[in-house]
Amino acid sequence: MADDQSLSARIEALEMRLTYQDETIETLNQAVTAQWQQIDALTRQIAALSDRLAQAETSVAAPANERPPHY
């Protein structure tokens, strides 16, 4: 009888642990998903800024022996 109660208590403790672990895993999964979405957005933003910078560099011609404006 004591063994049955001990076994029942151990099973109940394991079930509670499993429930908490499932909750923790779900919370971590949500955090990872949010982080990946942010990483994707930042990656797209960096690519767009790199394109804009490349376009700006090609559209500005280098001065060919121009005098500075103070002359």
From Swiss-Prot:
Q: Which InterPro entries match?
A: SlyX (IPR007236)
Q: What domain of life is recorded for the organism?
A: Bacteria
Signal peptide residues are none
**Family, similarity comment:** Belongs to the SlyX family.
Q: What is this protein called?
A: Protein SlyX homolog
Name its species.
Rhodopseudomonas palustris (strain HaA2)
Q: Which gene encodes it?
A: slyX
